[in-house]
Amino acid sequence: MSVPRSSGAKAIAKAGQEYRDGDYESAIVTLASATVDENDYLDLAYLLGLCYTRLHRFDEALLYLEQVVTQGAGDTRTLQCRMTLAYIYSMTGRAKLAEYELTKLVESSGESPQVCSALGHASWKQGRLDEGLRWYAKALDLAPENPTALNGYGYLLACAGKDLDMALTCCRKALTEDPGNPAYADSLGWAYFKLGNLDEAGPYLRSAAEALADNEESAAHVQEFERAVRSR
């Protein structure tokens, strides 16, 4: 005889569909009104954490995601929550915490292009550029056409002033894969700038800065570019 699903389980199933439909606010409302038992709570926390992340309500997302990671069984859901925590910490300038979560992911599930790329970014943000390059190189060994890894590796090469032709090639490939990504446009513009090709650099750097209006790094690139133009 089948056991009837609890009202909490039904609410979680409904919220899951709302999440997949991109209706994150409705999913939160559905879950907020649900009464769940202990067995269903981590399912609820998991969905709430993902919904709040999608809405960039990061403080609320952390509250739930950390519960899943702490109490979870090391399953796929727990790994996803660790990756999401790393994303939030990266977005909010907490690179050391992002690195901690990513290192735990490597320990539990091994290296992947996504995790290696994220570790490259976290290392660079903490001032360890050479280590960042090594992580991005690992990501490219695993997935040579991965645009995140291509962009990160190319950008860090440009920042270091190393192998600038390779930097340009990687950044160009990344933008070709994702032409609407302003961060990739900024990286390509920066690679051109480092090569001394101001005519090519300008359109990419300016369009990226316009799209990334609150990004200090992109704005700094444009300022340095404009100083170079005035002085040539």
Regions found by a protein language model. Give the residues of each.
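Residue-level recognition of tetratricopeptide repeat
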Residues: G16, L50, Y87, H121, ...
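Position-specific recognition of the canonical hydrophobic site in helix A of tetratricopeptide repeat
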Residues: Y19, T53, S90, W124, ...
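Residue-level detector of the short coil/turn that links helix A to helix B
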Residues: G22, H56, G93, G127, ...
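Short coil turns that delineate tetratricopeptide repeat
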Residues: N39, A73-T76, G110, P144, ...
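TPR alpha-solenoid repeat register
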Residues: L44, T78-C81, V115, A149, ...
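Canonical tetratricopeptide repeat
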Residues: L47, T84, A118, G152-Y153, ...
